[in-house]
């Protein structure tokens, strides 16, 4: 039996539109299905409602990188780095700093 994760997350959000975990999960599901525009809508909403949800910035940047939107990915990483610094999330800070360096030096 296959679980319709998009349906499940959508149902949760219909009951609680501010549920950060469900919003993030829905964005990830859309990303995994290659539906970048829908994923970015969810990541954007997540970041508007929960600006300190650091993982959202990193995963949004990864989705943008995978779809070839490197400039937007860079912008999302810079916002995520600021968020990681603000929240003291050193692991996310290191990960996103590394991703940003890879974008700046793709041949390195």
PLM segments and residue spans:
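Canonical positions in the second alpha-helix
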Residues: 11-12, 45-46, 80
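Structural marker of alpha-solenoid helical repeat scaffolds
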Residues: 15, 48-49, 83-87
């Amino acid at each position: 039996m296959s679980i319709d994760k998009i349906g499940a997350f959508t149902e949760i959000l219909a009951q609680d539109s501010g549920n950060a975990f469900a919003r993030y999960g829905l964005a990830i599901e859309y990303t995994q299905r290659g539906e970048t525009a829908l994923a970015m809508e969810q990541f954007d909403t997540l970041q508007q409602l929960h600006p300190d949800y650091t993982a959202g910035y990193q995963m949004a940047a990864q989705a943008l990188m995978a779809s070839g939107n490197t400039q937007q990915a860079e912008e999302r990483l810079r916002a995520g780095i600021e968020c990681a610094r603000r929240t003291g999330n050193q692991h996310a800070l290191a990960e996103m700093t590394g991703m940003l360096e890879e974008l700046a030096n793709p041949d390195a």
